[in-house]
Amino acid sequence: MNQQRQSDRIYLSAMDFYGYHGVLEAERILGQPFQVDLTLELDLQRAGLLDDLNETVNYAQIYEQVRQIMEGEPRALLEKVAEEIAEEVLKNFSKIKGLTVKVAKQKAPIPGHFQAMAVEIYRTVTKAYIGLGSNLGNKEENLQKALECLNDGPSLSLRDYSAFYLTQPVGFTEQDAFLNAVAEVETWLTPEELLRFLQEIENKLGRLRKERWGPRTLDLDLLNYGNETIISEKLIVPHERMYERAFVLVPFHEIAPHWIHPSGLSTKQYLEQLEDEQAIVLQVPKESITI
């Protein structure tokens, strides 16, 4: 019987700091001691075999990031402090695939006897793919700006993206051609929060769309989220028609030919059996796109 391999872990335990986080005025003036514990989940086998720091993470660098947050600008809630630590660590150390952050107030201003008041959060990194499309305004600029927003966004990291492809419209054909691409991100947002963030990017970049198949300034579709299958009023993942459309499969295949759909077929296999005869033209090579 095949058993799923457990994650290797690194522990940064009982890190003590003095900070000014809290809701009460006295906490922000006088400060108090805090204790932080981190559990990092990542593959340590290669580091162990090669005895090479480049194959793991630098504890000192992580400690310094935590210290700057704990001794830096005051936050009202421990929840906020913990989230900022998770964000900073996961953004800067791509080898980490799971992270537990515990932040404790050892002398919280609460009557009674206790060891500490603490918040603990867990964030796991998931790979997701996003389809990008535009056929209004400066289409190339729209996709470029969308990629920049993904690269700079909270709780995710842009890992890869395809070239930009010129494609003919589907459904309502009396409109300009589309420019399409696919991006790969690693995120610790939930699927719902990731969808909300994509909609924020669309709105920020002035999305205009008056009908379902009509022209739009920018369209961002969540194609998949890890290995999850989600069917809800707001979200269907994997995207229900992604494997029927050349404008999705061609750029998707460029960056993830071996991604496996829940049906058991890979992107490459879907592309090989695609019946969509829509013309796809390479418009902007990947090497011409700078993020």
Language model region names:
Residues 1-130, 134:
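N-terminal, polar/charged subdomain of small-to-medium soluble alpha/beta proteins
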Residues 40-42, 134, 184-187, 224-227:
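Short beta-strand-to-loop capping motifs
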Residues 43-48, 127, 170-177, 200-291:
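Flexible, gly/pro- and Lys/Arg-enriched active-site loops
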Residues 48-60, 151-190:
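Short, surface-exposed acidic-centric catalytic microdomains
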Residues 53, 145-150, 194-201:
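Short amphipathic alpha-helices in soluble, non-transmembrane regions
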Residues 90-98, 151-158, 205:
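Short secondary-structure junctions
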Residues 125-153, 162-166:
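N-terminal beta1-alpha1 ligand-phosphate binding loop
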